[in-house]
Amino acid sequence: MVSETALNAARKAYDIEAECISEMKNYFSEEAFSKAVDLLCNAERIGAAGCGHSGIACQHFAHLMCCIERPARFISPAEAVHGGTGFLQKGDVMILASRGGATKELFPILDICKAKGVSVITITENLQSPLAKSADVVLKQYVNRETDKYNMQGTTSTTALCMIFHALQAAMIEETDYQKEQFALIHPGGAVGERLNKKGV
């Protein structure tokens, strides 16, 4: 059996992240969010990039977009400067996720997007950061603290980023009138696919 200290830390983690999501609504900007949704809904292609935990969350976002038939892909910062940004064309959208807003690996991607006429949506906690100031739209990522006792691991910050991604997808489903019948076609696998493709459901 693990120690009571460890169990208490686990319980506290739930509280920390629940508090974060609840408080995030206080930083919700209808104007910025509407602009982001409009750009994403009208883009032919969507890219997403970040480093570390932010990068992993961006991979999740790209899949969320594909699940509502918006062509998207995660662009690794390493591959981006070796031709990977060729995926994006004028009028497309690039998501840059960086809690501090100063991830140097993302600066070249920003420059390329600006040169190609690709709109940039930055998600960051620091609205005065370089990546925020150069973006077309900035979405605020609020983080109360990480769940570990040292406040160092990318835990709550990842949850906050994913919450923004989930909110974007939810809004886009409404804005584009995406139907479950469409999803059923591209998701025949697993329990979800079985439920979607079951007659009468």
Regions found by a protein language model. Name each.
Residues 133, 147, 173-201:
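Internal, active-site/partner-interface "lid" segment
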Residues 20, 27, 32, 80, ...:
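Residue-level preference for alpha-helix termini and adjacent loops
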Residues 2-42:
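An N-terminal, well-structured beta->alpha segment
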Residues 40-43, 95, 190:
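Alpha-helix boundary/capping residues
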Residues 45-176:
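Glycine-rich phosphate-binding loops that contact phosphosugars or nucleotide phosphates
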